[in-house]
UniProtKB/Swiss-Prot annotation:
Protein name: 3-dehydroquinate dehydratase
EC number of the protein: 4.2.1.10
Catalytic activity: 3-dehydroquinate = 3-dehydroshikimate + H2O
Binding of 3-dehydroquinate, residues: 21, 46-48, 82, 213, 232, 236
Annotated SUPFAM superfamilies: Aldolase (SSF51569)
Pathway(s) this gene product operates in, as recorded in its UniProt entry: Metabolic intermediate biosynthesis; chorismate biosynthesis; chorismate from D-erythrose 4-phosphate and phosphoenolpyruvate: step 3/7
UniProt cross-references to PANTHER family, sorted A to Z: 3-DEHYDROQUINATE DEHYDRATASE
Listed Pfam families: DHquinase_I
Length: 252
């Protein structure tokens, strides 16, 4: 399997990499949060742009991105607008969503963008090509905060992301039972062993699914999300605890 290298970080080998999400409503809070996050132990900074109030002002959005880049220049920066339909804070049109991601790509400030699989096939393919032409990596994602589909469907979505040339396919699902967590882990393992030619990220959410956030190295998930302050999704644990467990499992 090929790995993905962003800055000096190699994703897809060794212990899962830790991603933290920064969710700030304005420039002042972006700055203060960035200073607080700078001391935390993580690998990738995800900026959840859907929490940013002044979204219609592209200059303001990019000014915030510049603050993050300058505060943590060594950390890979993942630019994510999570749509309302996939658990995000704001609903915007597909056109606005694509334009926002293109502006982030054009800025030269971000290393990766998150692109939702179900945005529309043509728009997704075009945006992936645009990102790659500007040396920006794509995490292609799908989130279901209500249920976990069958393993075959999980694998089909991850394979579709791969066929669309995502650098890293990602799926996050809500379990209704412990067996749903096993379904996610089974699908992850099968994808990783039989189909994946690049790193994937998978997780089962909430307290029920927390094992999936810890056992990525065993089942084939290359990264996991931790919380510096407020969790960005149900089931996230603190980055310090997360690093401890990931290291124990890696060294065992």
């Amino acid at each position: 399997m090929k790995t993905v290298t962003v800055k000096d970080l190699v994703i897809g080998t060794g212990a899962p990499k830790i991603i933290v999400s920064l969710m700030a409503k304005d420039i002042a809070r972006v700055k203060s949060e960035a200073l607080a996050y700078r001391e935390a132990d993580f690998d990738i900074l995800e900026w959840r742009v859907d929490h940013f109030a002044d979204l219609s002002n592209v200059e303001s959005v990019m000014a915030a991105a510049k603050i993050l880049r300058e505060t943590m220049p060594e950390k890979p920066l993942l630019f994510t607008f999570r749509s309302a339909k996939e658990g995000g804070e704001q609903a915007i049109s597909t056109e606005a969503y694509i334009a926002l991601n293109r502006a982030a790509i054009d800025s030269g400030l971000v290393d990766m963008i998150d692109l939702e699989l179900f945005t529309g096939d043509d728009q997704v393919k075009e945006t992936v090509a645009y990102a790659h032409a500007h040396d920006v990596k794509v995490v292609m994602s799908n989130h279901d905060f209500h249920k976990t589909p069958e393993a075959e469907e999980i694998i089909a979505r991850l394979r579709k992301m791969q066929s669309f040339d995502a650098d890293i396919p990602k799926i996050a699902l809500m379990p209704q039972s412990t067996s749903d967590v096993l379904t996610l882990l089974t699908a992850t393992l099968e994808m990783q062993e039989q189909y994946a030619d690049r790193p994937i990220i998978t997780m089962s959410m909430a307290k029920t699914g927390v094992i999936s956030r810890l056992a990525g190295e065993v089942f084939g998930s290359a990264a996991t999300f931790g919380a510096v302050k407020k969790a960005s999704a149900p089931g996230q644990i603190s980055v310090n605890d997360l690093r401890t467990v990931l290291t124990i499992l890696h060294q065992a």
